[in-house]
Amino acid sequence: MLYNNYKDIKLSRLGFGTMRLPVIDGKINEDETIQMIDYAMENGINYFDTAYPYMSSKSEVVVGKALARHPRESFYLADKFPGHQIADSYYPEKIFEEQLSKCQVEYFDFYLLHNVCETCYDVYTDPKWHIIDYFVEQKRLGRIRNLGFSTHAQIDTLRKFLAEYADIMDMCQIQLNYLDWTLQDAKTKYEIVSEYNLPIWVMEPLRGGKLVNLKDSDKEKLASLRPNESTVSWAFRWLMGLPNVKVILSGMSNMEQMIDNVSIFAEDKPLTDAERDILMDIAEGMKTGVPCTGCHYCCDSCPMELDIPLLIQQYNDLHFSASFTPLMLIESMPEEKRPSACLGCGACASNCPQNIDIPNVMSMLAEELSQRPSWAAICKQRAEEAKKAE
């Protein structure tokens, strides 16, 4: 297993993310999960990541049960405070104590503010809820060894949070892979976090499986260069080449994935610059959808002053893969800035160099959002599941 130094400890470069544990009959397959965690530890993985809502609020319990069979000093456990779910945000003391109990530990090695983003920014930072102050105090007391945050936020929100709180954060977890490097401008996020000297943890390294199932021509291109490397290996090795990435989390769902990933992280085989360029070319070919370049010419003539490129980006993201991020972002906007506020006047389209039928895209996005459960409804469902899990 490859390791990175972090402060005075060695962290496995591969971390076990427990958001996609094996399931049988609609419930977590505890036996297989325990086997996977045992195998992980036997083969050098020492970082385990869970969160309050994972697996219908059952992940913490099963992970805690599995890890409790091992010496506490033999693993590093990360959990997260569900401030992004709003309904749970106002009780940090209650939730933190509950998480410690569910995980059967007296402290968390890493504890993160879960998905600091536009929807929940004010909840996390409002002094009257004392959320951040509470967890800073828990760190002082030794019940949290390292305090950090995960985020799917837009760049301006990330900058704002770091400007205010970087000095009390130990690490940052972002969605990062060779596709989102440009698709979601993860490159800029990586650079911003690095400017604040915060080490980076990676989530969604395979883009929810999108980078596993490449089209045949792309697979053949990679196989011609590294015949014995899988598409999974290419994605991981691209991330290993980023110097500020400390831990790469993988949400493994079965023993086969675990064995494969462990073998990849057994040896460092850096990609050449030419190989990295090939992955960037493959990523560009994967970008289907509305061909917006983000020039913002359309915004100059919009009577509603909509951020059209941002809305189109959310439209493309919704169509590319299942994700809550677009829902959360759009729901954080005032009603008059959402796609449903588009008047359909067409002034924007006449200024678009790509000849995009922008009013039609806004209409389709508004319709699609109306057919999906709101982020608030999703949070309510998660809260109900959490109560049942108690």
Segments (PLM) and residue ranges:
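Short, acidic/polar
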Residues: 27-40, 88-104, 153-162, 231-236
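Conserved, mostly hydrophobic/aromatic
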Residues: 16, 33, 40, 48, ...
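Acidic (Asp/Glu)-rich catalytic clusters
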Residues: 6-10, 42, 64-74, 97-106, ...
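Short Fe-S-cluster ligation motifs
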Residues: 320-347, 371-390
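Beta/alpha (TIM)-barrel catalytic core signal, keyed to glycine-rich beta->alpha loops juxtaposed to Asp/Glu
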Residues: 116-306, 310, 320, 324-334, ...
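Active-site groove signature of glycoside hydrolases
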Residues: 101-123
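Active-site mouth loops of central-metabolism enzymes
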Residues: 19-31, 80-91, 119-124, 153, ...
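N-terminal binding-site loop/beta-alpha segment at the start of enzyme catalytic domains
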Residues: 1-75, 134, 140
